Amino acid sequence: MKILGIETSCDETGVAIYDEEKGLIANQLYTQIALHADYGGVVPELASRDHIRKTAPLIKAALEEANLTASDIDGIAYTSGPGLVGALLVGATIARSLAYAWNVPAIGVHHMEGHLLAPMLDDNSPHFPFVALLVSGGHTQLVRVDGVGKYEVIGESIDDAAGEAFDKTAKLLGLDYPGGAALSRLAEKGTPNRFTFPRPMTDRAGLDFSFSGLKTFAANTVNQAIKNEGELIEQTKADIAYAFQDAVVDTLAIKCKRALKETGYKRLVIAGGVSANKKLRETLAHLMQNLGGEVFYPQPQFCTDNGAMIAYTGFLRLKQGQHSDLAIDVKPRWAMAELPAI
């Protein structure tokens, strides 16, 4: 069974092909970073138009990479939510049209389920059950995972996602878009303990997160530094970046430890764009070593949005006979609890 996967939920156009016997046999990705850089963030209309231009050529490139033709494809998976509605519609329309033309089934895939299952693309993949930390620009969730489609969100951000807080704080520091990765690189030059940021919602019971206060704290710290120094010098920027990242990572680690204790699980999966963060990986690896458990991450190329995770997730569901109807339907907001189990 060979499944074509299409990802167009935000600012990456991803196309991949997953083979039941060989695994991932094609992976094509185009990023719109340069397109949105001048605006300091994703412009939905521009994102949609660029997906229109890039999706079909990437499908052709993926087929060529795998040395396949359209007749070799057994099904099509596409991201149907959550995400930007216009961007989602581009991928859904192309996927449904091809499925009709090629006479194969198609299925809409939940974007965050794709991220959650991305570590399964690795040879050293986690076994169920496990706790998953989904951490990206749009989501920060702790999920109890007992199988494919057997998800319970046990904690989530009540305001900003961790990735969003990274990007907004990076903007305060004058860093280029995309800011999260730039902030992490800058933090490596920072001085520990010069600034201390709070660890929000760690002093109370529960597994929910809140990162909007950290953004405000960062803004106040920047303003005070400018007042004291006359301008924001590079070392001060690095020191603020270090303190901010340390607070976010520490907060995530504290909540992960609680979630593992509550569930009794010994496996932790970290997925989503922020899972590529070096400091986060090191901290959670140390945590799981101390707890006698295991931690799993996607390969770096599968941390950000990609077609491979959509192709794989679609394969799992199509193999069980699940598929979407002919309607081109997308869900900009979509709870994982609504997904059927396999």
From Swiss-Prot:
Q: Which InterPro entries does the entry mention?
A: ATPase_NBD, Gcp-like_dom, KAE1/TsaD, Peptidase_M22_CS, TsaD
Where does the record say this protein resides?
Cytoplasm
Q: Where does substrate bind?
A: L134, V135, S136, G137, G138, D167, G180, N277
Please name the GO terms of the biological process aspect recorded for this protein, alphabetically.
tRNA threonylcarbamoyladenosine modification
The entry's keywords = Acyltransferase, Cytoplasm, Iron, Metal-binding, Transferase, tRNA processing
What is the cofactor note?
Binds 1 Fe(2+) ion per subunit.
Function (record text): Required for the formation of a threonylcarbamoyl group on adenosine at position 37 (t(6)A37) in tRNAs that read codons beginning with adenine. Is involved in the transfer of the threonylcarbamoyl moiety of threonylcarbamoyl-AMP (TC-AMP) to the N6 group of A37, together with TsaE and TsaB. TsaD likely plays a direct catalytic role in this reaction.
Name the chain's protein.
tRNA N6-adenosine threonylcarbamoyltransferase
The primary gene name is: tsaD
